[in-house]
From Swiss-Prot:
Keyword Cytoplasm attached: no
Sequence similarity: Belongs to the sea anemone 8 toxin family.
Record bears the keyword Cytoplasm: no
One GO term describing the cellular component: nematocyst
Name of the protein in its database record: U-actitoxin-Avd8b
Lineage, opening ranks: Eukaryota, Metazoa, Cnidaria, Anthozoa, Hexacorallia
Signal peptide, first to last residue: 1-19
Domain of life the protein comes from: Eukaryota
UniProt keyword annotations, A-Z: Nematocyst, Secreted, Signal, Toxin
Compartments in which it is found: Secreted; Nematocyst
Amino acid sequence: MKSLVIVFVVLLGVAMISANEEELLAILQDQRNDARGGCVNKYKRNICGTLVTPMNCIAPRTRMGKFARRFCKFMCGFC
């Protein structure tokens, strides 16, 4: 009886994964067709936007400016 329950649980899991595969492929296709072309901030909002501000993007010789231009491209408008 235990093995029958295990088989049903496994079959249910496989059915759920295969049903979601089509949705995942649609989401992946939408991300590939995104107009930004993959240009995103490489760090979360707590760094790109709070700690590093858009004013840092135009600072030519500072460490924060170099960091912003390299890792916060979407925030700086380099896309």
